[in-house]
Regions:
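Alpha-helical transmembrane segments in multi-pass membrane proteins
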Residues: 108-135, 152-170
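N-terminal membrane topogenic signal
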Residues: 8-36, 59-62, 84-87
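Structural signature of hydrophobic alpha-helical transmembrane segments
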Residues: 54-69, 123-133
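Membrane-helix interface linkers and caps
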Residues: 114-116, 133-158, 182-193
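Cytosolic-facing loops and C-terminal tails of multi-pass membrane proteins
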Residues: 335, 345-387
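Cytoplasmic-side transmembrane-helix entry/capping segments in multi-pass membrane proteins
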Residues: 86-97, 148-156
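Juxtamembrane "helix-exit" motif on the non-cytosolic side of transmembrane helices
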Residues: 40-51, 77-81, 104-114
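Membrane-embedded catalytic scaffold of the fatty acid hydroxylase/desaturase
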Residues: 153-353
Length: 387
């Protein structure tokens, strides 16, 4: 099924006049509306608890947005199906109708028992819409590689990573934050915490950038230099086309390790919640920006903050660029520890060297364990019949 999706929807040119653009808009928007309708039906299990007060306060606005999205997706689907005779436009129209039935209040959802766990469907939908509205036009007007398609090779796999990381946000938080919180409660009080918390929020924000980037620099470097860790990080480097969606291609083991290492100094030093929130929003957007297909170079900032030019070289498969530019935000760490590579021209080829990594989301998940799975089969597998 995954191979069929990639064959049908990857490396496609959205040419005007063939109904492809309207069909793509219809299918994408109707799927998001379907997720949104499910969030209205089952808010206790499909929405993020921190955002529920916002939904309650502006329920009319969100409901209007859902209905508007359904109408727009149905309109594009009908145009593509009827005028251009594109079957995917018909599929988008059908999905829009299903979303309308679920979202209009005709179906009464059963009352679900209160559970401590949730799936962040709302977080996935809202984040995808915002990022797509920002980065698709940005990459269209300022593309580093103008020939790269929006539906380029690998985007189906990357959207699955994006979806998994956003819907499973509670799982990631539980597996990283909870152990740290438990451990810190058993430590003696840190005398630095009151001093940190007494500082203004803007200063704490800057300190967060410096401290967290220092810890993640060494983890990132270890992922390149330690073979066991590299097998997980290689998944991120397997993309051969850089854009905003490529930043999502991260193995779950790498996500857990990075979030744990990044979260540890935040709790140990006791940064204020407002500073942490500002940091998370900023660094999340920045991480997507430095992967995006844009030609911005920022010559006066290139050693102060990581730019797309800087990080694209980290992903380059050119020999001089391999195992360089580890910093996520502060390039000076690479300068100090002699791991920087910034020539005067832009990177042009990407991917891993010497590794054949599968394209499938599921196969990429199991790829780092392939060697150990084979060893297990050799030791415990059924012996072959000598006859």
């Amino acid at each position: 099924m995954t191979d069929q999706l990639r064959a049908k929807f990857e490396n496609i040119e959205l040419n005007a006049g063939l109904g492809k653009i309207s069909a793509f808009i219809s299918m994408t928007l109707s799927l998001l509306c379907l997720f949104g309708a499910l969030c209205f039906l089952f808010p206790s299990v499909l929405t993020t608890p921190e955002l529920r007060p916002l939904y309650s306060k502006h329920s009319d606005l969100f409901y209007f947005s859902l209905m508007a999205g359904i109408i727009i997706s149905a309109g594009f689907g009908a145009f593509s199906a009827i005028v251009r005779q594109n079957r995917y436009g018909f599929y988008g129209l059908c999905l829009a109708l299903i979303a309308a039935v679920l979202g209009c209040g005709v179906i009464q959802a059963p009352v679900l028992p209160s559970v401590p766990f949730y799936a962040g469907f709302d977080y996935f939908v809202l984040t995808l819409i915002i990022l797509a509205l920002v980065f698709i036009p940005l990459e269209g007007f300022f593309a580093k590689n103008p020939k790269q398609k929006i539906l380029r090779v690998g985007w189906v796999t990357d959207i699955k990573y994006f979806m998994f990381s956003h819907i499973g946000i509670q799982l990631f938080s539980f597996l990283t934050v909870m152990p740290i919180q438990y451990w810190i409660t058993h430590l003696p009080s840190n005398p630095i915490v009151p001093w940190v918390q007494a500082q203004p929020i803007w200063l704490q924000f800057i300190e967060l950038l410096i401290v967290v980037d220092f810890t993640t620099y060494w983890l990132h470097r270890a992922m390149h230099e330690v073979n066991f860790l590299w097998r997980f990080h290689a998944i991120h480097h397997s993309t051969e086309h850089m854009d905003w969606l490529a930043s999502s291609r991260l193995h779950i083991v790498e996500v857990l390790m990075t979030r744990f290492i990044a979260t540890l100094p935040i709790f140990l030093l006791g940064f204020h919640t407002s500073a942490v929130f500002a940091y998370l929003v900023f660094i999340s957007f920045h991480a997507i920006f430095i992967h995006s297909n844009v030609r911005f170079r920022f010559p006066y900032l290139r050693w102060l903050i990581a730019t797309p030019e800087f990080h694209h070289w980290h992903h380059s498969s050119e020999k001089p660029a391999i195992d360089k530019n580890y910093a996520a935000f502060i390039p000076l760490y690479d300068v100090i520890f002699k791991s920087v590579y910034m020539p005067n021209h832009l990177a042009s080829v990407y991917g891993t060297v010497g590794y054949k990594i599968p394209n499938s989301f599921v196969k990429q998940f199991t790829w780092p364990f392939k060697k150990y799975i084979q060893r297990f089969k050799q030791h415990f597998g059924k012996p072959k019949d000598p006859l």
